[in-house]
Amino acid sequence: MMMDILNTQQQKAAEGGRVLAPHTISSKLVKRLSSHSSHKLSRSDLKALGGSETISDGPSQLTFKDRYVFNESLYLKKLKKTALDDYYTRGIKLTNRYEEDDGDDEIIRLSNGDRIDEDLHSGVKFFSTTPYCRKMRSDSDELAWNEIATERFKWQSMLARVLKGDIVKGEKTRIANQVKKPGLNKELSDEIWLELKAWLNGRTMQEMEQSLTYLRDSSDSVFEEIMKFQIPQGKILSLDALEAILQDLMNRYHSVVSYWPNLKKMYKDKPITNTAEFTARIDVMNSWLNFKTNLTLRRQELDDWINRFSPISSSDNCQEDFDGVPQWNCKMKILAEQLMKEKNIESIFQKKIFYPLSPWMFKLKLHFIVYRETLTKMNIKYPYERLRSLLAFPVYLIKEVILTRLSYARKLKNPTMMMIDQMIDDFNAFIRLSVQLKYTLTKYCSNLPFDVDFDPTFENTVIEAIRYLFFLLNLKLIDSSKQNFKAPDLLLKYWDHLKNTGHYINGAETVIPNEFLKLTLRLVHKLQFYLLKQQNFPPTFANASEAEKWLSSIFENLGAMKRKLNRFSNILVKAFQNSAVYQINHNAQLVKKLKDAHYFLVYSGNTFESSGVYMFAAPELLGCDNDTILRILRNKSIGCDLVPKLDIGNNLNVYDITTKETDLNILVSKGEDSKGIPYYRVVANSSSDLDRHAHQSKKKNFSTDPFDQHLDEKNNEVFELEVALSSLGALVVLYPGEPVVWDGPVYKLPGNNLFASNEMDLGKIGNPNTLILLNQGSNYALTYQIDKFNQTVGDSVSFIEKRCSLNSIESSLQKINKAYYKLTYTVLNNYKGILGSFMKQCPGNELLNSIFMFGRDFGRSFLKYNAFSSKRKYVIIFLMVKLGMNWLKFLVEECDPTDQRTFRWCVLAMDFAMQMTSGYNILALNVKQFQELKERVSVCMSLLISHFDVMGARATEAENGMQQARLNIDTEENIDEEATLEINSRLRLEAIKTLEKTMKRNPRQMGKVLDATDQGNKYLLSLASSLSNVSMRWQKRSFIGGGTFGQVYSAINLENGEILAVKEIKIHDTTTMKKIFPLIKEEMTVLEMLNHPNIVQYYGVEVHRDKVNIFMEYCEGGSLASLLDHGRIEDEMVTQVYTFELLEGLAYLHQSGVVHRDIKPENILLDFNGIIKYVDFGTARTVVGSRTRTVRNAAVQDFGVETKSLNEMMGTPMYMAPETISGSAVKGKLGADDVWALGCVVLEMATGRRPWSNLDNEWAIMYHVAAGRIPQLPNRDEMTAAGRAFLERCLVQDPTMRATAVELLIDPWMIQIREIAFGNSEKDQVPILSS
């Protein structure tokens, strides 16, 4: 069998310790071909006749083309029946349940031929270590008799002593310490300034000085005007009018400043200009003018970005008010559509919105805080309306992006698991970005005289995204047919992401807890269903080993998932329980202690009091507003951390500044992260200030920029938590059942409609004579509040339980607790079914004993981690008592008392029975049960005594017995292989037929993207006029690779969920387009006419103003070159399979009149099923073409270089044929150069070395090829004789004698793999008639 051959060769290769990376990929194809074969060829039909033109088959003569046509149809038929990976194809239905320098490092050769040894400056003695200088030392005697040389050495020594002496050293030090040359004195500099100014004005110095004196004396009016400038109260000025007034005043001020040579002179002559108020007024007017101009520019940049991002075909003329964001909506939708195609939308927001705006937002807030009083005196307001529009823009945009993504997501019916994972990542990013925007903008406007106009539906849209995220999580974790035992880990991950969302988004504080609880409940139910299914329908096992393996897997999966779910449930319980219920023991004493502890009554306007319910607030809440009380009652902080924090990884963290950080020396610096995304960070103006500011930022949380990793906040977390905890208060809801007299302080809540929500009906929580403690803030503070309250009231109350004040959440918590109870009950009550089944099929005692041990551990886990009523506790304990008794019964009746394992199990079972019957539990047994317990314990005790090892005698005897024992196993295997294969083939064919009915095909949707009336885009219009121009909704995923002109990404078709490869070619100017247009057009022309399983599928092109997107088939397996990086392919059968697929694709190309001309491992890809695909047809040409266009590519397809003529060389030298390099007029048969390149690829697969790897450069390679030499063939250890003969036919120097791809398909080396794949049975021969 084929698989036996593959497995045997794989084992041999593994023993050799070499990499077989491609083996598993290609073996899929061989298995499919062998198992799906229905039409088979005889061995006689596949015999090769060398270079003859025909082969004989009975009376008819068959040409190579006829045989190729038949084989090709059979090959294509098998590939079309290929089963795909269900991760990409199976829909999930909603159910109810990544040059060394070879020069000489020691010797540096100079241009004049001399040499210098680098050890000259290394501190080692030069004349004793360098060979070159040792020779110089041998000539020293001759130099000593040379008078000229002696004179020069003396002069050299004298110069060295002078330059190294103290005098020269001192002068060097003095010169170095001079920071600058002596400057001109002040008087001389002023005279120069005056002389220059007089010369410029055509006056003498005396005249100029008199004029300046007069002008300085008359400048007081300008300074007084600045000091008295104020916009009249009630006068409304437009921004342009105010700008004209301020600009005129500032122009006159700057004109007056020019009367003095410098500001110091002006400050001395006019002291008023050196006052703080005057300086502040100048700064305010300058800042106002700067901010108006820059905010206008930022707005214009956003408009340009929106227009540039929209497609060429967009003809929307959106008329919007300049300062009005809602009027942006028509373009928001277009922009959102385009942003959906980008993978990382957060980086788009950072580069296009946050990065340009953040420094100006920061500076405006800083100036507002510093000059607030001056702004009030001058009655000047910053251009807040423009600021509001820029602040609100990303809010409106993210809302539109969410709505657009939701509309596409809801159109998908039964999405695949890959699509679900992609959508989960998308919505998680959208929610994270929305929360960051809401938090940052709200905080930014907290001390500004305006608020951001959030879209009224923004928060509802975010909540819809949250709901849909949980819908997707349900599909992934619950509705998938596969059991996901890592679901609790995934839930914990998204809990960490979403738990603080409700603190910022109104309405999410109840949605998120309820959705997490529903998911957890469904997971527990699914786990119980899985357990029942395994108990009621266990598989049939051939031997005890299979049964033990299956049972161990069940116990491991159940136990691990139960433990993880328990831990996650406990996290939810602790996060959601915000109240403690007490019973009142002494009503009057309780009221007195509350008054003594400075509690105050919160009067609700008789809303609660009329029902006998009274609210008291802790002294920490004294002076709070109404919203604080309502947030406690409505549990707005449910699930949040004690100090909610957001990890903002973009420049939203630069927007805000605290009121204490008013140092104008603070600067904003630029930088880039590892991905090339630009960012700003806040720094100080000097190194000393930087150190100080870095220290302060930890305390004030000023710069939380993640790029500043040196700002570590861990040392401040404990202190911050302590401060937050001590500042939190609590509400006490008293339901005494009788009137309460209160003579302490009272706080009255205004209005009577504050408690309209049903969740506020606190009277339903407890019964009369009950007290409820509601904590403020995070529910993690509840334990602290309980301890604090207990110290206050003492024994006047008794603690009952913790719970959640929201009825819906408390109900879900109780349902989860009940589900755990049912699951544990199922395990403890139904273990007998599994025990009985295994006793019949596999009566191995060790396997059966593990069932009891699993039940014991499961019950213990429930009692340890779950809270429940005493009744349910009694039921579980009683079942565990019965489990212990049955365990003892099993050991007594079924196990071998002489087996050492039985002794070990008895110890465990008796210990468990003792624990479960301890205390009053023993009384739960009736007389019969107690009697049975005593008898079984008695037998087990006897067994224990019989196994006691006295003085080591038993151990010695056992050791001797083990040395004498021998294991004799006689295994007989009698399997009908033919019947097994027949059943296997039938089942596979049925599965393929079912899959074919449900497989989705990607229709080529036609559409126009370009504006046909635009005359300035002739190249784009030419591309857009192609029949392959498509219009589809797609989204960019991960980056694959890039080159000179283009980058390749994986993408997802949002309309049907298919994975695509998108080549994105940026168009910077007309010159660039003129250069790459022929390349794009040529490759499109070739790809449009090809359709074959071994050629990458081309889907179409999408044309925009600034880029062109080419859609192709996505090959997830990577390139053949990347596989060969791990080493050669050890298994020759794998090489044969790959070569077979390469020949099939190459024969199709040549039959279609296309020559690839750049075949190499980098241009050969593998899809996720391991099928070979030819890519990169930039150098390809058709037979009817009048000219040839070429392009040199890397591992990823890339449009790169300019068009070359027909006579120029194309391809990669090490894979180029001799006739291509020499430019010979004799080209041989069609595609002969491709066959040579294919032989070089097969050679590289067999040896793991590039062809001509022993040569240094491409010129040497081309010389050897043109000289008639061929690459070194594999040795006998690397390839069989048939394989080497195949290579010799490919690497023939004369192109006219070189075999074609069709001829190579019936080479004996290919016949071998074809027979293995398709078979050679005589009864299934298919006659072929000559054409």
Curated annotation (Swiss-Prot):
Pfam families: Pkinase. Kinase involved in a signal transduction pathway that is activated by changes in the osmolarity of the extracellular environment. Activates the PBS2 MAP kinase kinase by phosphorylation. The gene is SSK22. The lineage of its organism: Eukaryota, Fungi, Dikarya, Ascomycota, Saccharomycotina. GO terms for cellular component: cytoplasm. Interacts with by SSK1. One of its GO terms (biological process) is p38MAPK cascade. Present with 56 molecules/cell in log phase SD medium. This is Serine/threonine-protein kinase SSK22. It comes from Saccharomyces cerevisiae (strain ATCC 204508 / S288c) (Baker's yeast). It is an enzyme of class 2 (transferase). Signal peptide: none annotated.
